[in-house]
Structures are given as structure tokens and as C-alpha cells.
Amino acid sequence: MLGWLVIPWNQIFTAACGCFLSDRNYIHMMESNLDALQKTMEELKNGRDDLLGRVSIEEDKGLQRLAQVNGWLSRVQIVESEFKDLLEAMSIETGRLCLLGYCSEDCISSYNYGEKVSKMLEEVKELLSKKDFRMVAQEIIHKVEKKLIQTTVGLDKLVEMAWSSLMNDEIGTLGLYGMGGVGKTTLLESLNNKFVELESEFDVVIWVVVSKDFQFEGIQDQILGRLRSDKEWERETESKKASLIYNNLERKKFVLLLDDLWSEVDMTKIGVPPPTRENGSKIVFTTRSTEVCKHMKADKQIKVACLSPDEAWELFRLTVGDIILRSHQDIPALARIVAAKCHGLPLALNVIGKAMSCKETIQEWSHAINVLNSAGHEFPGMEERILPILKFSYDSLKNGEIKLCFLYCSLFPEDSEIPKEKWIEYWICEGFINPNRYEDGGTNHGYDIIGLLVRAHLLIECELTDNVKMHDVIREMALWINSDFGKQQETICVKSGAHVRMIPNDINWEIVRTMSFTCTQIKKISCRSKCPNLSTLLILDNRLLVKISNRFFRFMPKLVVLDLSANLDLIKLPEEISNLGSLQYLNISLTGIKSLPVGLKKLRKLIYLNLEFTGVHGSLVGIAATLPNLQVLKFFYSCVYVDDILMKELQDLEHLKILTANVKDVTILERIQGDDRLASSIRSLCLEDMSTPRVILSTIALGGLQQLAILMCNISEIRIDWESKERRELSPTEILPSTGSPGFKQLSTVYINQLEGQRDLSWLLYAQNLKKLEVCWSPQIEEIINKEKGMNITKLHRDIVVPFGNLEDLALRQMADLTEICWNYRTLPNLRKSYINDCPKLPEDIFVPLLPEKSPSRFFFF
């Protein structure tokens, strides 16, 4: 009964005094603190929501939120939970207050409650003061980037040997050496992938391609690119980069994999700390020279030898295929002789095996043996066996034109991915293949040659693109042949990817026939040149190039191909370009050039002119009279627009087969589609700043359309005209549902930006081969494909069954009212990449069932 008396008197006294005398005044300030707390909590929640919005946008790009952001959000979550508890007790505690809030019926409880409110208020204020993060996310740096490795034979034992050596505490640096094409890179890739199993053992595994013409900064950039997600280091000096690398790696247990060393690399100059037993780090490199192993002070060297006869035969058999080997009883014996000529070199076995994979007669196999025996070129070192073997694949090409096309592919840097169409345009203008195009402007002959080169293993087809590239060893062989096996090296100057800062002084201008300066650090070209024999000049993708002097083009009477594309800061073409009377190919796309020199009109032999993605403006007045031989004219995404004057010029270009253009006037668009020859030449079309009730696009007239862009337009209706003139002339009783494909057969890319007047884009169903679609800043669009319209189209055209059946890449940005993509978007069978941003009415998990293991990637099509 007297249990209440157990409360210590001093506690009661302290609480009572706290009601009136405490500096903190927890009881008296309780109500005002509660009001302030509720307001600041609202601010905190708003701040949290804003931050989560920023984080969501960055995570949609594939970035990872910062730990400090996560920590702040976690603290907010805890405070929010505690605040809810306080609110639940608020009515009880405030109800106990008396004497105008200066006292309480239960001073101890009110004092404790008031103290919690006060402290929480301070904590919320502190959180609010820290809510403004400059950065909220960063790129995810994986410890190991797994490599895709082709099928191998005889490599497993070597992988285990190298791995065992690496796991030895006494070995910090491991050298893998062997001749070119023997599989050193594949071995290094296999080691790289084994580190996936030991992610917890090492902090980071870094892959660096060194190559023959390496620069220290190039190696540093690759290392820093793996270590840091920011790009602030890009403009630093070489010594500063070395310091950044050292300070980062010094704290880590790292693995550095260096592929293709041709000479010693000073790791100290790069900034890489030496691997020691104490730090547990490792360096592994591949090289063709044992001397490099010694200079690099490798703790152990492992030779990557050619395959044994049995292993070589197994690889060759797999490459040729059993169908060919069984096509004649004598072929297996002859095939073993051919395989033996490869001396167990995997690259040669693959290349020659691929070349022989379509030879079904013993005569062809016997001829192959004779050619291999007669190719007795002697070269020091690796070239003694590799180049003659590789040259066999070159010699086996059908004719001279295919060989010329192949050799041309060596003018770009190692592993450069080049569009097939670009190669073909080069070859046509160089005169390697027939310049007469088909009526649709295409040249199947060029694609056929590329197919032959790919099947011969001389070119590599790139995944998911229409590009091809050349293996670096094959490229070396091609350059060797191009220089007449090294006898006429002055006739060709290729500095692609060499990071040179100026045009070399040792060029023999009188003799040189081909020059290529690609991806260099050249800023100005000011030399005076006299090049009576120069026919090909490639100066492209030089990001620092700002000027080419007038005198550079003064005397190049035989120049046929001039490619200046992707020099972003090049703003002017020299007037002396008018001296290039033999020029047939001119590409200035992706440059800062805004006007064309008057002298361009003198280039009457020009058949290819590319002005895409430039600031070039005007109507190209007089182009038909001054450049009458043009077959290809491209000004897509430039400031040139087809108007009445240019329309007449284009119609007068009687040889024109390929056109990319921009149109602002709907009547001009109608006139283009009304001209069968002109319309069929359109490959890329940009409709810009067009305001009209209706736009009609004819799938018949625009049958060759590959890219369509619609920018800043107000169009109430986009109608697809899929009927031919013959079909329109039929009576209604004669018209049946379409059984053939009625749509744009070649349209693969559509980009829509700031389109008004459209609630849906159901007309896109007529682009059944669409691979890339980007729609942005078009707030009135509610659906990409409307179900009712879509069903009507599919009923009319029976071959349109699955909407977007070939779509691979999809980007939707800033679409406030977009609620749906299409009624059965989950059947998109080929979607591999999606990017959705600021589409609040679109379900957040819209593609989760489609891409369970893929993160959205940011990409742009143009």
C-alpha cells in the first residue's frame, strides 16, 4: 500500500526543481519543442524524399549510392521511428501539463518526455544541416572484371601452373612469354577470371593493354579508370597521376595484369608499388621476348609454347569441322599435313582452319599444302613462322580486289571497331570494288567481301553491332604486306593510336601513298607538304586537333580519300582543299566546322560528301552543277535543311544513291516522297521544328529509311502510308488484308525529342525491325503503343504479331504522362538494354521480369 513511498526523495526534488529551475526547461518548453519538432521532421522527410529521388536517378544509370548517403538515410529512418513513438505519447504527456505548462501532474514522466523531444529536435536539426550532398552516387568498381574467353585446347595445365605460381608468397611478378598468336592473352584472361573466385583475397584486379607504341600516360589512364569512378584525374600531369596511383594502390592488395609488353615498363614511373611478400600484391605480364621478362625482374617466367601435335590437331579439327573432314576419305590425312604446317600456333590453326572450313575437294587441300611450302619468307624472331602462316590466309583470298580491301583495314588502331558501311564507302572511292551501286544505293558486293574476310578469320565481327575489327597480329601482318614486306616502308605512314603529338619529321612526302593519323594528340598540322603520290589521308578522331594550315593541302594531286571526321575542335577547312582535284571521298562529320570553303565547288570528282553532326549551314546552292558526280550526300543532324532550292539541286544530282537529310517543311517532305528516285535514296531523315496537323510517311517511298529523328515538332497525326499505287487503284471489294510486310523493312533506329500533339506512337508498329528507340521530353505521350490501335494494325497486317519483336535498346526520359509501353511489353524477346528516367506514371519494375540480371544502362543513339 505504501509502494509509492519507495521513490527517492532526491529524485522527486530534482524533477520538481526541473519544472521551474532547469536551464533546459524540458517541461515548460515541451509544447513549443513538439511544434518545432513536427515542422523540422516534415522538412527532414522532404529532404529525404528529394535525396532518394536523386539517388534513384543515379542508380538508374547503373551507379552505386555513396556510403555516407546510406548512413544519413539510415539515421533518418531511425529518427523517424523514434518520432512516431514520441507522437503516440504526445497527447498523454501534454495532457499532464498544468500551471500554464510550467508544471506537470507527473513531473518525472513529463521531464523525461520533454528531454527526449528536445534532444530529438537537436538531432533532426543536425540531420537537416547535412542533407545537401554534392554527390550521391558513384560508378561501381568491381574487384574483378570477368573476361569472355573463346574455346581453348591444351591451356588448362598452363593455367594451373601459372595459378600455382601466383599463389606462391615468394612470387610477386610473373612473366608469361611466347611468340605472337600463341595464346598469351587467353592465358592472362583465364588467370583474370580465376580471381573471381578469390574476390575476398584481393582488393582489385586491374587489366591493362600496353601494346607496342605504349605511352606511360595511356597505362596510367587505364589504371586510374579502374581505381576511380571520377574523371578529375584526366587533366593531371604524368607525375601527378603516378602519385595518385601510388597513394591508392599502396593501401591495397592488388593484382595488375599487363597484356602485350614489347619493352620494359618502369612501374615506378607509372606509380605502381612493387609487389612484396608483405603486401601480397601481384603483377603478371605477357610479352613476346624473354629479355622483357629479365628487364621487368620477373620472379618467375613461364613460357607459353605452341600446342603439341595432338592438341594442334584437335584445335584444327574443331575449327575445320567434321563435315568437311568427312567429305572425302583422303582429306583427313591432307588436313593433318596442313595442321602440322601451323607449328602448333593457335592463331594460325584458327585462321587457316577457318580458311579451309569450306574446302571440300582433295585438290583444294593439296593446293593449300603447296602454297604453305612455297611461302618461305625468312624473318627474325616471331616473324619467321607467324607472318608466312598468316600470309597464307591473305594469299588464299580470291582476287586482288579482296586483298586490297583487307589491307586497307590495317589503317586503323588495334581493336578499332569500324562500321561495315564505312569500309565499303572507302573501298568504292579507292576504286577497289565496283562503284556502280544498286538502285537502292547499296552494294552487296562490299558486304560479301566483309563476309569472306570474317570467315577467313582476317576480320572479327563485333557482338551486337554492325562493326568489324582486326586482330592486332593480323594487322601487323597486313601492314607488313602493305609495305611490300618491309621493303617500301616509306610508302605508308600509319600512326593510328600511337599518341603522337605532331606529324613525324621523317615522312618521305615524295613517296608516301597512304597516311593515317587516328586517335593522336596532334593539335595543329602546319607542315608544308608536297605529296605527288598520296592517295589516302585519314586524320580522324584526334580530339585535340584545332587547325590544319592552308599549305598542307597545297600539292596532293592524287589524293582520293580524305577523312577528317570526329575531330571535334576542328572548326575550319583550309581553302586550299580546292587543289584536291582527284578527291572522291570527303568526310567532315562530327567536327566543329560551320561553313564550307568556296573551293569545295572545284572538287568535281567527289562522289561521297559527309557533313553529318556538324554546324554546317546553308542550302548547298549550286551543288548539282559543281559536284555532279555525287553518289552519297549526308547532312543528317547538321544545320542544312531541304528547302525548295535544295530540293531542285538534289533532283538534279542524277547519280545520287544515298541521302541523309533534315526537313522542316511538311510540303517538302511530301515532295521528297513523291519523287521515287530521291525518296528511295533516303537513309536517315530528321524532321525538325515542324508544326502541322498531319505527317504522312510512306513505307513504299521511304523503303531504304534506316534512321528517323523527330525533333521539336507539333504534329497532331503521324500516318503511315503502306499501300503501293497499284493497291490503291483496287476497288474496295478487291482489297484483302495485307499478307506481305507493309512496314519500314530497314528502319532500325528512331529518336523522338520534344514531340507535341501525340498521345501515342502506335505507328511505330510499322517498324518491325526497330532495334533502338529513344523518346524524351514529350509530355503528352501516354502510351507508346495504344492497345486498340495496335490490335487494329495487327488485324490488318497479319505478319505484325509481336510489337517491338526486334527491339534491343529502349530509352524513355522525361515523359510525365507515360503510363504504358505496349499492351504486351513483357513479350519483348530481344530487349537487352533499357534506360527509363523521370517517367513517374510508368511502373518502376516494368522490366524486372525481362532483365533479372541486368542493370539499366544509359545510352544515346545520336
Swiss-Prot record:
The LRR repeats probably act as specificity determinant of pathogen recognition. One of its GO terms (molecular function) is ADP binding. Keywords: ATP-binding, Coiled coil, Leucine-rich repeat, Nucleotide-binding, Plant defense, Repeat. ATP binds at G178, M179, G180, G181, V182, G183, K184, T185. Probable disease resistance protein. Residues 24-61 form a coiled coil. Transmembrane segments: none annotated. This is Probable disease resistance protein At5g43740. One of its GO terms (biological process) is defense response. LRR repeats lie at residues 511-532, 533-555, 558-580, 582-604. Residues 135-438 form the NB-ARC domain. Belongs to the disease resistance NB-LRR family.
